[in-house]
C-alpha cells in the first residue's frame, strides 16, 4: 500500500459523483493480494515437494519480472495519457494469469505462472494513485489518500483472514486447497476488474510525474507481491540525463537502501520454509505469520511519522535497523538451540510478525531522507530510482537466500542477513541529513509539519 507526502500545485477539477465508490475495485484487488501473499513458500514446499532453494528462485524470478513490467506499463500509460484501462488490464489480466495454476504441476510451470501474473498485474501499479490524484482537487488529496490507504489495507487484511480461515477449515485437503486459493483469488481479481470497468472514471486532467516532485509513495507493506502495490515515480532511462544529475550523496544513499533490502530478503524469504522444515509449521501458521507482519506494520505507520518528526531521521533509522539486527540475531541463535518445538514455533511466528513493526519506520525514514538529500527538481527522479533499486535488492536477496539456506544452513543465512544489515546501518548512519527541509506535506491524510 502507499501513502503520500508532499505538496504540488494543481488546478481545480470537477468533483465526480460517488468518488469513494472507486475504492471498491482497489478493496477487492487487495483482498486477492492478501489471499495469495503467503502462497509461494507453501506452494513450492508443500504442493510441489521442493525446497528453500527453489522458493528463493521462484521469488526472485517473479520479482524480476515486475521491475521491467512496472516501467513498461508506467511509460505506456504516460505516453497514451490513459489511466483507467491499465487498471482494468491489471485486474482482468491477473484473473487469467492466476487461472494458469491448473497447469502448475512442476516448479517451472509455477514460476511461469508467477511471471505472467507479475507482468500483467503491474499494469495497475503505476497508475492507481495518479488516477485518484487526477480526479481530486489538491485540497482533498490528504483525505482521499487516507481513505484509499485504509480501504486498501482493509482489503489486504480481509484477504489474509479469509485465507487463514479457508486453509484452516480445509487443512486435510492441502493438495487441493493451495491451488484453489489461487483460483479464488483469480475470481476476486475478476470482480475487481469488472467493478473498475463500471465505476472507475477516466482522469479528468493529466498530472505529469516529473512535476510531482513533492509527492512520494511509502510502502506500508514490505513484501506484498514482492513489489509496491502503487507507485507514482518510476525509473525512466531517457530521463536520467535530463535536467540536473543526481547528487552523489543521493545515489549512494539509494544504493545503501538496496543493500539493506538485500539483507532483509536474506532473512524473510527462507524463514517460512525454515519453520515448515524444522518445526512442522502448518499452512495456517504461515498465514497467521504473514497476517501478524502486516498488522504490526500498519500499527506502526502513524508512530513512524511521529518518530521522524520527534527523534529525527538518523535516530529513527538507527533504532529500526538495530532492532531488526537484534531480532534476526535471536532467530539465528534459535536455529542452534534445542528447545520444545511448540514454544519455538510460537516464538518464531512472533519474530517474523514483529519484524513488520519496524518496516514502517524504515520506509518513511528512507523516503524522507532521499527527498532531503536530492535537489528539489530531482526528487521525483530520485524516488523512481529508489523504487527500482528496492526491487533489485529484493530480487538479489531472494535469489541468494535460498542457495545459502539450502547449501549451508538456515542459521548461517540469518547470520549473513544480520551482518549485511549491520554494514548497511553503519554506512547509512554517516549521512548528514540536515539539508533544506521539505515543504508541508501529506501523511495518512493529515497535513504534517516539516521533517526535522
Q: What are these language model-derived features?
A:
Residues 123-136, 360-374:
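Intracellular juxtamembrane helix-capping segments at the cytosolic ends
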Residues 6-64, 249-290:
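Helix-loop boundary and gating motifs at the non-cytosolic
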Residues 85-99, 315-331:
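Structural signature of the two symmetry-related core transmembrane helices
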Residues 69-82, 167, 300-314, 405:
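Helix-to-loop junctions at the C-terminal end of transmembrane segments
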Residues 27, 97, 108-124, 342-361:
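Hydrophobic core of transmembrane alpha-helices in multi-pass small-molecule transporters
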Amino acid at each position: 500500500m502507499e501513502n503520500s507526502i508532499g505538496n504540488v500545485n494543481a488546478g481545480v477539477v470537477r468533483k465526480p459523483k460517488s468518488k469513494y465508490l472507486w475504492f471498491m475495485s482497489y478493496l477487492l484487488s487487495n483482498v486477492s493480494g492478501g489471499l495469495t501473499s503467503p502462497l509461494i513458500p507453501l506452494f513450492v514446499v508443500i504442493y510441489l515437494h521442493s525446497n528453500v532453494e527453489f522458493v528463493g528462485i521462484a521469488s526472485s524470478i517473479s520479482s524480476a519480472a515486475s521491475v521491467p513490467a512496472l516501467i513498461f506499463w508506467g511509460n505506456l500509460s504516460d505516453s497514451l495519457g490513459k489511466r483507467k484501462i491499465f487498471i482494468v488490464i491489471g485486474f482482468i489480466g491477473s484473473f487469467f494469469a492466476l487461472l494458469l495454476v491448473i497447469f502448475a504441476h512442476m516448479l517451472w510451470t509455477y514460476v511461469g505462472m508467477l511471471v505472467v501474473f507479475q507482468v500483467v498485474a503491474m499494469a495497475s501499479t503505476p497508475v492507481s494513485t495518479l488516477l485518484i490524484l487526477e480526479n481530486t482537487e489538491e485540497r482533498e488529496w490528504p483525505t482521499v489518500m487516507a481513505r484509499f490507504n485504509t480501504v486498501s489495507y482493509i482489503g489486504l487484511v480481509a484477504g489474509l483472514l479469509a485465507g487463514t480461515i479457508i486453509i484452516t477449515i480445509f487443512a486435510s485437503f492441502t493438495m487441493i486447497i493451495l491451488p484453489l486459493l489461487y483460483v479464488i483469488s483469480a475470481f476476486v481479481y475478476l470482480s475487481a476488474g469488472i467493478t473498475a470497468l463500471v465505476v472507475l472514471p477516466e482522469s479528468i486532467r493529466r498530472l505529469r510525474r516529473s512535476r510531482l516532485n513533492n509527492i512520494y509513495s511509502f510502502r506500508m507493506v514490505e513484501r506484498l507481491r514482492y513489489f509496491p502495490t502503487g507507485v507514482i515515480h518510476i525509473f525512466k532511462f531517457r530521463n536520467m540525463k535530463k535536467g540536473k544529475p543526481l547528487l552523489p550523496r543521493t545515489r549512494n544513499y539509494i544504493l545503501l537502501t538496496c543493500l539493506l533490502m538485500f539483507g532483509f530478503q536474506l532473512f524473510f524469504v527462507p524463514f517460512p520454509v525454515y519453520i515448515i522444515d524444522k518445526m512442522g509449521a502448518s499452512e495456517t501458521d504461515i498465514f497467521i505469520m504473514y497476517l501478524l507482519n502486516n498488522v504490526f506494520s500498519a500499527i506502526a505507520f502513524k508512530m513512524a511519522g511521529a518518530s521522524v518528526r520527534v527523534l529525527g531521521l538518523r535516530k529513527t533509522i538507527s533504532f529500526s535497523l538495530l532492532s531488526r539486527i537484534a531480532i534476526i540475531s535471536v532467530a539465528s541463535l534459535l536455529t542452534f538451540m534445542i528447545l520444545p518445538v511448540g514454544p519455538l514455533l510460537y516464538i518464531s511466528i512472533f519474530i517474523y510478525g514483529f519484524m513488520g513493526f519496524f518496516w514502517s519506520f524504515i520506509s518513511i525514514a528512507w523516503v524522507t531522507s532521499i527527498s532531503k538529500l536530492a535537489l528539489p527538481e530531482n526528487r521525483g527522479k530520485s524516488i523512481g530510482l529508489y523504487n527500482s533499486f528496492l526491487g533489485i535488492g529484493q530480487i538479489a536477496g531472494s535469489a541468494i537466500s535460498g542457495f545459502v539456506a539450502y547449501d549451508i544452513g538456515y542459521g548461517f543465512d540469518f547470520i549473513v542477513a544480520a551482518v549485511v544489515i549491520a554494514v548497511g546501518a553503519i554506512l547509512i548512519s554517516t549521512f548528514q541529513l540536515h539539508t533544506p527541509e521539505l515543504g508541508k506535506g501529506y501523511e495518512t491524510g493529515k497535513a504534517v509539519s516539516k521533517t526535522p
